[in-house]
Each structure stands twice: as structure tokens, then as C-alpha cells.
Amino acid sequence: MGGSSYDVLRKQARSLENEIDLKLVAFSKIGAGSGGGGSGGLGGVDTSPLLGEHVFDSLSEEIEQMLEKLSSLNESMSDLPASGAAAMHTLQRHREILQGYRQEFNKICANHTMRIEREELLRGSGLATSSGSPSISGLNRREMYLKESGHLNSASHLVNDQINIAIETRDHLHAQRQAFKRLQTRFNDISNRFPLISSLIQRINIKKRRDSLILGAVIGFCVILLLLYAFN
């Protein structure tokens, strides 16, 4: 009886896993905005985003209930007496599948939330026109992303221009720094030359004094000779 109950629960779990798998595929498409009630056959234009959100929310609740049911089935199987290593392996596999489904479900919900916030941000920044509709007002997502890409490109060009200005300013400052270095070198050379000039002038003055002394001595000697000659 226990084995029969286990087989029934296992079949129910497999059937529910298949249903959840299909639901997650549809849920992912609706969350990405590429399917569901958000398209009205007008070339990809979102004509009824509120309906798409309603479908997403409804499917989200349905998948949550299915995941809870699958978790309950797994718990029921684990409560049955162990019937071998194969059964334990199968139960572990069902738990891993459930965990994978939960992760995928949370990932889809998070991506959908980010997409909605992104569209709200674009709408608030003026990338989408406002005509009273809660949608993106006639602009499909491709047009909206193209406009956003244009704004990003403009911002990128502006940043590049600012970077070029900064580089030119840096080069100009570097050139000024080199000019100041050259001036400083010249001043140092001049200051180093002044002691040499001063020393040269001092030597010239010493030589003049020495020549004056020699000339004075010669003149004095000549005067003495003349006086001696005159008195004799």
C-alpha cells in the first residue's frame, strides 16, 4: 500500500512539474513583454499593457500555487517509509527540480520588475509621449530603446568631449611646467656664473694694484737717481 501511494504521488509530482515547466515558459515570455495579452497584433505595439500586467499577475499567483502544491507532494513522499536508495534518489531529484523552478520563477519576476521600472524611468524622463494612456503611448519598446540609445550616445559624445578637453588642459599644463623648468635652469646658470664674474673682477683689481705698486716703485727709484745726480 505504501509503494502504491508513493507511485501515485510520484506521478502527480511529474505531471505537476510538466505543467509548471510550460507555465514558466509562458510566464517568461509575458515577463519579457514578448507575449501574452500585451500585444494586439499592431506590429509589436503595446496596446493593452494593463491587460498584460493582469495576465502576468494572474499567472504568477497560479505558478506560486503550483509550486506550493509540488512542495507539498514532495513532503508527502518524504513522509512515506523509505523503500530503497532509488526512491531516495528520486525524491532528491524532485526537490532539486522544485528548487530550480523556484529560482527560475524568482528570476523572471525580478527581470519583469526591472523592465517595468526601466519603462517608468524612460517615461518620466520624457522618452515616451503622454497621451493619457498608461502604456508607453504608441511607442513600442524598440523605438523607446532606440531613443534611449540615442540619448546614451549623446551622453557618451559629451563625456568624450570633456575627456578631450581635460587631456588638452593636462598637455597645456605640462608644457607650462616644462617652460618653468627651463626658466629655472637659466636662472640657476646665471646665478652660477655670477661668482665667476666676481672672481674675475677681483683678479683684475688685484693685478691693477700690483701694477700700480710696481710703477710707483720704479718712479720713486728714478726720482732718487735724479736727485743723487743733481747733488753730485
Swiss-Prot record:
Pfam families: V-SNARE_C (PF12352)
Transmembrane segments: 212-232
Membrane-topology descriptor: Single-pass type IV membrane protein
Cell location: Golgi apparatus membrane
GO cellular component: cis-Golgi network; Golgi medial cisterna; Golgi membrane; Golgi trans cisterna; membrane; SNARE complex
Keywords: Coiled coil, ER-Golgi transport, Golgi apparatus, Membrane, Protein transport, Transmembrane, Transmembrane helix, Transport
Molecular function as annotated in GO: SNAP receptor activity
Domain of life per record: Eukaryota
Coiled coil (residue ranges): 6-23, 52-80
GO biological process terms, semicolon-separated: endoplasmic reticulum to Golgi vesicle-mediated transport; Golgi vesicle transport; inter-Golgi cisterna vesicle-mediated transport; intra-Golgi vesicle-mediated transport; protein transport; vesicle fusion
Cytoplasmic face residues: 1-211
Endpoints of the signal sequence: none
Keyword Cytoplasm: no
Quaternary structure note: Component of several multiprotein Golgi SNARE complexes.
PANTHER family with a match to the protein in the record: GOLGI SNAP RECEPTOR COMPLEX MEMBER 1 (PTHR21094:SF2), GOS-28 SNARE- RELATED (PTHR21094)
Function of the molecule: Involved in transport from the ER to the Golgi apparatus as well as in intra-Golgi transport. It belongs to a super-family of proteins called t-SNAREs or soluble NSF (N-ethylmaleimide-sensitive factor) attachment protein receptor.
Family stated for the protein in its record: Belongs to the GOSR1 family.
Protein name as it appears in the record: Golgi SNAP receptor complex member 1
